[in-house]
Amino acid sequence: MRNIRNFSIIAHVDHGKSTLADRIIQLCGGLQAREMEAQVLDSNPIERERGITIKAQSVSLPYTAKDGQVYHLNFIDTPGHVDFSYEVSRSLAACEGALLVVDAAQGVEAQSVANCYTAVEQGLEVVPVLNKIDLPTADVDRAKAEIEAVIGIDAEDAVAVSAKTGLNIDLVLEAIVHRIPPPTPRDTDKLQALIIDSWFDNYLGVVSLVRVMQGEIKPGSKILVMSTGRTHLVDKVGVFTPKRKELSALGAGEVGWINASIKDVHGAPVGDTLTLAADPAPHALPGFQEMQPRVFAGLFPVDAEDYPDLREALDKLRLNDAALRFEPESSEAMGFGFRCGFLGMLHMEIVQERLEREYNLNLISTAPTVVYEVLKTDGSVIPMDNPSKLPPLNNVEEIREPIIRANILTPPDYVGNIITLCEEKRGSQIGINYLGSQVQISYELPMAEVVLDFFDKLKSVSRGYASLDYHFLRFDPGPFVRVDTLINGDKVDALSIIVHRSYADRRGRELCEKMKDLIPRQMFDVAIQAAVGSQIISRSTVKAMRKNVLAKCYGGDVSRKKKLLEKQKEGKKRMKQVGRVEIPQEAFLAVLQMDK
């Protein structure tokens, strides 16, 4: 155990952690030069296209240090986007140290601050690394000063590297060996292993990535999953180098994969503890906190026959994505589907993209909404993630919305624009700190305002320089109403939205105008109305197409023409009573693009 080092890399999006990982793998001889490709650990095609890391990945590498000893480096790559912060907390729980990678040209950004605090809270040794020093705009001294001012850790010994050119990567490895402590033995000698991640393999069943805290796991031993109480027989164990390599055992302090022929998707929950069935550990490891989904949306198959396939696909994704929640839902407008919970809009986009690509599903998604708390008149509090499930208003005492604390880091030039944006979004300012060349702005904002398009607007008002990190604070009561959309007098449940009362008229008007452009013309007038309760607040009409029934009458008696027009009017009236209006997918997305 003395020569094992477990570490992860934390950084903001685009500060170069996957490239640094590539260089570390190359220098330790994990892959031959011909097998190397850029971002070797970002294995998912969506990760490679968007240039972001979504899933944490792990590699075990042997490294011969300058003192002649061979060290085993277990390295877990982590994502940088705020939506995937739960992946980071999970990876950090399995490590003793972390490399904090900061772009020397851009300086400290909000997500690296948040992840660094998580690492310090978990008692990890943080080693600062300044990347991209080959750029002409890199300023190492300023970046060091920012790390000390914004994060508050000593950056005097920060290693300055260029991951792209490979400069000083050997110094990073020496810093890992000498500054990150080895795993400490636990107070029990019984097997305890933390499940960091699980995924489904078509041939092997469930494969789990584990960090062995104490004891050892061998093929043939019977393990117990502590939360479910089920036992499984271990088939194979091994490590990633980054290729999958089988071993005879995984010992204390090591990070590797195990395959215990678990065929059930929920057999190895992430964050759970494994122990030996014959000689179990007295208690489970303190896992990381369960992430609560913050954004909910309905996912419905375009073809109703795909419903079982969608359920199976979500089950498999859930194994690999601990924060995804879903439950069956039926909608009058859309048929059968699932109500899914996500961590944020990027998470939602990526889940939908993975379902469509990896499982060949054609999906419709409804407008995303946050979770509100509803206090009923009988004193009970219920969570509400679907506007159409709001109880009748005479049973509702108050509606509470989720409030978040946002930390924004920005250059001083854009402070005015950002404050204006936050005020527009009903924010209340907590404080402003000037830290060297950066300004830290803290705001309390309603989550509903942040989730949809706040991130995009923040980037545009600051020309891409501001960065955002947020965490949930509390629920606050407010004057909220539900705006329903009626098409020809029928309520469309999938288009209901919850808004602040002061915005209801404007949102209703915008929604009606948007829908008018999107619903195709029929042979009869289509009335689109927005209503709060029984009061109609806005209306627009899609005019009917008209067939010229008088075309065949050349001159002649006017009563003949009247008769034909009356007949047409009767037919339209009858058609309107039985006619159904098809609502296209774009109409459901119109709710999203209201402010644009």
Swiss-Prot record:
Every tr-type G domain range: 2-184
Enzyme class name: hydrolase
Residues that bind GTP: D14, H15, G16, K17, S18, T19, N131, K132, I133, D134
GO BP annotations, alphabetical order: positive regulation of translation
Record-linked SUPFAM superfamilies: EF-G C-terminal domain-like (SSF54980), P-loop containing nucleoside triphosphate hydrolases (SSF52540), Translation proteins (SSF50447)
CDD domains linked to this entry: EF4_II, EF4_III, LepA, lepA_C
Intrachain S-S bonds: none
Membrane-protein topology: Peripheral membrane protein
Localisation: Cell inner membrane
Leader sequence residues: none
InterPro entries according to UniProt: EF-4, EFG_III/V, EFG_V-like, EFTu-like_2, G_TR_CS, LepA_C_sf, LepA_CTD, LepA_IV
Protein origin, superkingdom: Bacteria
Claim: NAD is one of the keywords in the record: no
GO MF term list: GTP binding; GTPase activity; guanosine tetraphosphate binding; ribosome binding; translation elongation factor activity
Catalysed reaction, written as an equation: GTP + H2O = GDP + phosphate + H(+)
Keywords assigned by UniProt, alphabetized: Cell inner membrane, Cell membrane, GTP-binding, Hydrolase, Membrane, Nucleotide-binding, Protein biosynthesis
GO cellular component: plasma membrane
Protein EC: 3.6.5.n1
Function comment: Required for accurate and efficient protein synthesis under certain stress conditions. May act as a fidelity factor of the translation reaction, by catalyzing a one-codon backward translocation of tRNAs on improperly translocated ribosomes. Back-translocation proceeds from a post-translocation (POST) complex to a pre-translocation (PRE) complex, thus giving elongation factor G a second chance to translocate the tRNAs correctly. Binds to ribosomes in a GTP-dependent manner.
Family statement drawn from the similarity comment of this UniProt entry: Belongs to the TRAFAC class translation factor GTPase superfamily. Classic translation factor GTPase family. LepA subfamily.
Annotated protein name in UniProt: Elongation factor 4
